[in-house]
């Protein structure tokens, strides 16, 4: 099951999930991409999103406005839907309208092999890595996440030093091996790291849970601001979606 948490009043770009992407609301575009891989449900926090999904025949459920993260919203949706404890759950974002089907498939495959949860990342350049809106991730020897940060990591202390490994930009999608793991993660108390960086995935690392990271090729960009949307619409052609 793929669940897309969709919040209306995003702090940086209010109502963004309803913004038009070549004739379709952003969240609808995301859901249509997801439905190419598996059954998808949008977890809404507002009737306006719910009605938009229904208009375009996208399955949706109404959840609380008071969740602290998209993961918590996914869990409520899974409970409303009555998902079985052993069902895998993918958490995609309502602000990734250009996410390729191949990336979702890669996440699904990685989730099957991950004992706890999985996510994806892509190689980025130094200029891209400077943006705090593009989260960076560093990996251990087994391709599990060591840390996620809005800062540039790893930092090169010595001038002239060359990077031994590529910079990796996190793609904010998650796969949970089963619903019970989603419940386990949401039951953990928020940690100071996730509150400082505003990155919910740091809770799992803080409590020593493994996040497997699949490196993929992707041109997708997350839409965090109005500027992101304007730039993306210039880059992507409606014929490619």
UniProtKB/Swiss-Prot annotation:
Name of the protein described by the UniProt record: 3-deoxy-manno-octulosonate cytidylyltransferase
Superkingdom of source: Bacteria
Gene Ontology terms, MF aspect: 3-deoxy-manno-octulosonate cytidylyltransferase activity
Organism: Helicobacter pylori (strain Shi470)
Keyword match Nucleotidyltransferase: yes
Enzyme class name: transferase
Cellular component, GO, one term: cytosol
Function according to Swiss-Prot or TrEMBL: Activates KDO (a required 8-carbon sugar) for incorporation into bacterial lipopolysaccharide in Gram-negative bacteria.
Pfam families named among the record's database cross-references: CTP_transf_3
GO terms (BP aspect): CMP-keto-3-deoxy-D-manno-octulosonic acid biosynthetic process; lipopolysaccharide biosynthetic process
EC number: 2.7.7.38
Catalyzed reactions: 3-deoxy-alpha-D-manno-oct-2-ulosonate + CTP = CMP-3-deoxy-beta-D-manno-octulosonate + diphosphate
Homology family: Belongs to the KdsB family.
InterPro entries named among the record's database cross-references: Cytidylyl_trans, KdsB, Nucleotide-diphossugar_trans
Keywords: Cytoplasm, Lipopolysaccharide biosynthesis, Nucleotidyltransferase, Transferase
Stretches that traverse the bilayer: none
Pathway stated in the Swiss-Prot or TrEMBL entry: Nucleotide-sugar biosynthesis; CMP-3-deoxy-D-manno-octulosonate biosynthesis; CMP-3-deoxy-D-manno-octulosonate from 3-deoxy-D-manno-octulosonate and CTP: step 1/1; Bacterial outer membrane biogenesis; lipopolysaccharide biosynthesis
CDD domains per UniProt: CMP-KDO-Synthetase
Keyword Nucleotide-binding applies: no
């Amino acid at each position: 099951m793929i669940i897309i948490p969709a919040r209306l009043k995003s702090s940086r770009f209010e109502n963004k999930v309803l913004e038009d992407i070549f004739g379709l609301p952003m969240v609808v575009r995301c859901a249509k991409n997801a439905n190419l891989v598996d059954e998808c449900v949008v977890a809404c926090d507002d009737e306006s999103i719910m009605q938009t999904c229904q208009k375009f025949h996208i399955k949706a459920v109404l959840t609380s406005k008071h969740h602290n993260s998209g993961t918590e919203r996914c869990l409520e949706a899974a409970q409303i839907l009555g998902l079985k404890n052993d069902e895998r759950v993918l958490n995609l974002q309502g602000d990734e309208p250009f996410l390729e089907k191949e990336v979702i498939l890669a996440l699904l495959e990685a989730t099957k092999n991950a004992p706890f949860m999985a996510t994806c990342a892509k190689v980025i350049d130094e200029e891209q890595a400077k943006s705090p809106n593009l989260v960076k991730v560093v990996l251990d020897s087994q391709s599990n996440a060591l840390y996620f940060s809005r800062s540039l990591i790893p930092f090169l202390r010595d001038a002239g030093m060359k990077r031994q490994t590529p910079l990796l930009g996190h793609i904010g999608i998650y796969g949970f091996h089963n619903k019970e793991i989603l419940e386990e993660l949401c039951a953990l108390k928020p940690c100071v790291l996730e509150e400082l960086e505003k990155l919910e995935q740091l809770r799992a690392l803080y409590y020593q849970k493994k996040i497997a990271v699949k490196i993929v090729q992707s041109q997708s960009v997350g839409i965090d601001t109005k500027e992101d949307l304007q730039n993306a619409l210039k880059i992507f052609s409606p014929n490619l979606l």
